[in-house]
Design a protein with these regions (language model features):
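Basic/aromatic recognition patch in beta-strand/loop cores that engages polyanionic ligands
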Residues: 37, 48-83
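Basic, Lys/Arg-enriched alpha-helical interface segments
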Residues: 2-59
Length: 83
């Protein structure tokens, strides 16, 4: 299934990766991007593999690291996943 980032998610991801690079170095940024990519691949193959949000119906919660979580929804037309 196709996975795409909302405009807000793109902006937040850019800020996060800049922070990681500036404060923690290129290895931390690379490690985070690898973990994020694994999670995106996971939900692309198995969209309902993460738990549904208890606060919002139709949202799923995906934990990337202890400090980082993203929420996504499954879009039916066209069939895709929005982060």
């Amino acid at each position: 299934m196709n996975v795409f980032l909302s405009k807000s998610a793109e902006e937040k991801l850019l800020k996060l990766t800049e922070y990681l690079l500036e404060d923690w170095g290129s290895k931390a940024k690379k490690d985070f991007i690898n973990k994020l990519t694994e999670k995106i691949n996971q939900i692309a193959l198995q969209p309902q593999s993460c738990p549904q949000s208890s606060a919002f119906k139709n949202l799923y919660k995906c934990v990337v690291t202890k400090q980082t979580t993203f929420y996504y929804r499954i879009v039916t037309n066209p069939k895709s996943i929005e982060i």
